[in-house]
Structure formats: C-alpha cells, structure tokens
Amino acid sequence: MSQSLIVALDFPGKQEVEQFLHHFEGEELFVKVGMELFYKEGPAIITYLKEKGHKIFLDLKLHDIPNTVKSAMRSLASLDVDMVNVHAAGGSSMMKAAIEGLEEGKQEGKERPICIAVTQLTSTSEAMMKKEIGIEKTLEEAVAHYAKLTKDSGLDGVVCSTLEVPKLREVCGNEFVTVTPGIRLASDDVNDQVRVATPKRARELGSSYIVVGRSITKAENPLEAYKTVKQQWEGVTV
C-alpha cells in the first residue's frame, strides 16, 4: 500500500502548511488540499507542494453542469495533481465530462489524475439523508447506487466510509478505488464526522486509501502520529 495514506492539510494558509511540513523534512507525503487552503492560496500552493516532492489529492468536490466541470477539470489536470473528485449526485454526464477534461488537460507524457466521486459525506447520517436530502433508500443502498453510477461513468472510484467498503467491493469489484476519510486513532475525538473508523479497521475492511487529518495535524508530534497511523494502516512497524 505504497503512499496510500493521505494526510489532510486542513490549514487556512501556506504559512501553517510550511510549519506543519517542517516536521516531515525528507518525507514524500501524499497530501490532501481542500477548499479552504486552495481558495486562499490558489494554484501556487500546488506548485509549492509539488516542488517539495509530495503527491496531491485536490479535494474540491466539483458539482456543476457538465461543460463547466469539464473545463474546470482541464485546468486542474494542468496543475499535475494526482487525484481529484466530484459529487456523484451531479450525474453520469457530468462525471463523463470530468474525465474528458482531465484527459485534455493532463501534462504531456503523464497519466490523467485519478478521479473519484463523493457518494455521501461522512458527516451524513441515514436519518439526515432521508429527512433533509429526500433519499428514501438506506444509506448503504444510496452509497452503492452512486458507486455503481460512478463506475459506469468511467471514474476510478469513490470517497466513502470504511463501513461501506465491503459492500462496494461486491458491487464494483476489487479494482474499484475506495478513498476513506473519517479516520481517527482510537484515542481521538470524532469531531464533526459521523461514520468514522481507526486505520486498522480501515485496513481490515479493504480501503484503498485512507485520509487522516486531525489525528496527525493536531498532534503534539505530527511525525510520530504519522508513524503510528501508518503502522496501524499497513500492519507493520515503521
């Protein structure tokens, strides 16, 4: 599982990112850049992280009409990011357009970024989904439906809860990528996410990638916390 641990850089700006990455001199990480950081710093933060040798999951969760998403993905691919995402709720035409944009915008001689779709946010409970979003399926059924739609639209995988991974393996096969946020060490507060799991549990359930934020970024010693998460995730001593 080389570089399948993604560290969420949930910081307000570049200064905080630099302070955090100071703990990881010489380490090549797979990092997630979300809306807050990207909207503050723009493409320059991607250039900075790439120059440091890090892989990047640009987590913007695009959801718009197909042509707009295609154009946006063309631009994002030109930044040489490694992974991007959309909302599966945008539909098949939008997701197919996303792939077209990535293919058109990728740097010469390189593969297009991995493209995944969000099924349901990890902050979404089944009760919330039914009452507020108006989906009458069970949470598992809704996620499986979106995952199959994602695969049929030509995307590489989905963002999902670890608890949903086994079902998605049945529906979409073992090659389908599952990226699972909501990962916490057993001693951590779960904060605002409802469907959470430990790194060990994510490994047991078959996640392809895990995304870890506060357990590492808020730790007194981020490097040691990273090693602890990595050990639990990979099942080996590092």
From Swiss-Prot:
PROSITE patterns linked: OMPDECASE (PS00156)
Lineage: Bacteria, Bacillati, Bacillota, Bacilli, Bacillales
Class of this enzyme: lyase
Highest rank taxon of the organism: Bacteria
Cited SMART domains: OMPdecase
GO CC entries: cytosol
E.C. number(s) listed in UniProt: 4.1.1.23
Protein name as it appears in the record: Orotidine 5'-phosphate decarboxylase
Pathway: Pyrimidine metabolism; UMP biosynthesis via de novo pathway; UMP from orotate: step 2/2
SUPFAM superfamilies per UniProt: Ribulose-phoshate binding barrel
An individual GO BP term: 'de novo' pyrimidine nucleobase biosynthetic process
Function summary: Catalyzes the decarboxylation of orotidine 5'-monophosphate (OMP) to uridine 5'-monophosphate (UMP).
One Pfam assignment: OMPdecase
Catalytically driven reaction(s): orotidine 5'-phosphate + H(+) = UMP + CO2
Active site per database record: 61 (proton donor)
Oligomer and partners: Homodimer.
InterPro entries linked to this entry: Aldolase_TIM, OMPdecase, OMPdecase_AS, OMPdecase_bac, OMPdeCOase_dom, RibuloseP-bd_barrel
GO molecular function, one term: orotidine-5'-phosphate decarboxylase activity
Keywords: Decarboxylase, Lyase, Pyrimidine biosynthesis
Family: Belongs to the OMP decarboxylase family. Type 1 subfamily.
Species assigned in the record: Bacillus cereus (strain G9842)
Binding residues for substrate: 10, 32, 59-68, 122, 184, 193, 213-214
